Amino acid sequence: MENLNAYFKSVIDQDTASVVLCDLQHTILYMNPAAIRNYAKRGGAALIGRSLLHCHNASSNSRIQEVVDWFAASPEHNIIYTYHNEKQNKDVYMVALRDADGTLIGYYEKHEYRSPETMERYAF
């Protein structure tokens, strides 16, 4: 099978929800275009290479580390619900990133919007 990395990157790049990938030291490795736009007031693309922990308060940082520790405790621990954003009507999860051997290599925040789509169907 050919290398699928370009396909996977394109899937993430086209997602309308923010995707921010972090390593286990909480360094932001990648932000998709939606994340760059959504976090523009906090620095947008300039956040890449910086610590995600600098974007949160001490309480949030503690919870982030608690979740990462939980991910590390078992290869069965891969997703956890973190909160509901009422204003944007979305649920937010933290998701473990693992290599082919199941070793934890990082994490990302997953946004699931609950509002009905407003885009016209098949609006070419």
Language-model features: where?
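Sensory modules in modular signal-transduction proteins
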Residues: 1-36
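Sensory helix hotspots in PAS and closely related PAS-like folds
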Residues: 36-37, 53
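PAS/PAS-like sensory domain cap-loop motif
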Residues: 37-47
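PAS-family sensory/regulatory domains
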Residues: 45-59
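Soluble sensory domains of the PAS superfamily and closely related sensory modules
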Residues: 58-79
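Per-ARNT-Sim (PAS) sensory domains and their PAS-associated C-terminal
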Residues: 75, 79-91, 99, 105
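Sensory coupling linkers of modular signal transduction proteins
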Residues: 97-124
